[in-house]
Swiss-Prot record:
GO terms for molecular function: GTP binding; GTP cyclohydrolase II activity; zinc ion binding. Binds 1 zinc ion per subunit. Pfam families: GTP_cyclohydro2 (PF00925). This is GTP cyclohydrolase-2. The gene is ribA. It comes from Saccharophagus degradans (strain 2-40 / ATCC 43961 / DSM 17024). The active site is at residues 126, 128. Its EC number is 3.5.4.25.
């Protein structure tokens, strides 16, 4: 595995003080970060969010997706609990990259859904690689998690790499008129689990 730990620093945020841990992936030349709060290396299950980079949603406040709202909600939940980790993976556009994501958005403007747009560009519906998580979890000493997710692929990936998911916490937030069809496509074509009671 080519993912290596680089360095850590403090990261003050409106939700509280996090630690930011940097990792490099030589195989893709990408840099990933993990935000942690509290001691995540103890044996108690850790509240965890696996979040893929979304420039448009996280930084530009786009309403086409629910990514920005999900990131902020995850940070808020961890701050309330006082302990947790957010794995921020640099896999923009479900792994197709920012410029291809813009191309996919153009196709969606013309009527394609999010899966059809990826496929018309020659990509799979979800190109993300979750194998990069294993060395990050190992470095941080996290073995058991309470996973904030609606995505069954993330559950399968963590289980495959030996992470014990003791609880799945539904993570639904950010629905609006601009992303309602997008979320329904994620549910219908990608198997995302929406419409459940929040289990925290």
């Amino acid at each position: 595995m080519t993912v290596k730990y680089v360095e850590s620093s403090k990261l003050p945020t409106p939700m509280g003080m996090f630690a930011m841990h940097g990792f490099s992936d030589d195989s893709s030349d990408k840099e990933h970060v993990v935000l942690t709060m509290g001691d995540v290396s103890s044996e108690e299950p850790v509240l965890v969010r696996i979040h893929s980079e979304c420039l448009t949603g996280d930084a530009l406040f786009s309403l086409r997706c629910d990514c920005g709202a999900q990131l902020q909600a995850a940070m808020h939940k961890i701050a309330i609990e006082g302990r947790g980790a957010i794995f921020y993976l640099r896999q923009e556009g479900r792994g197709i990259g920012l410029l291809n994501k813009i191309r996919a958005y153009k196709l969606q403007d013309c009527g394609a859904d999010t899966v059809e747009a990826n496929e018309r560009l020659g990509f799979g519906a979800d190109m993300r690689d979750y194998s990069i998580l294993k060395p990050m979890f190992e470095h941080l000493g996290i073995a058991q998690v309470k996973l904030m997710t609606n995505n069954p692929r993330k559950i399968d990936a963590l289980t495959q790499y030996g992470i014990n998911i003791v609880n799945r916490i539904p993570h639904e937030t950010g629905r609006n008129p601009h992303n309602a069809d997008y979320l329904e496509t994620k549910k219908g074509k990608l198997g995302h689990m929406f419409g459940e009671k929040d289990g925290e």
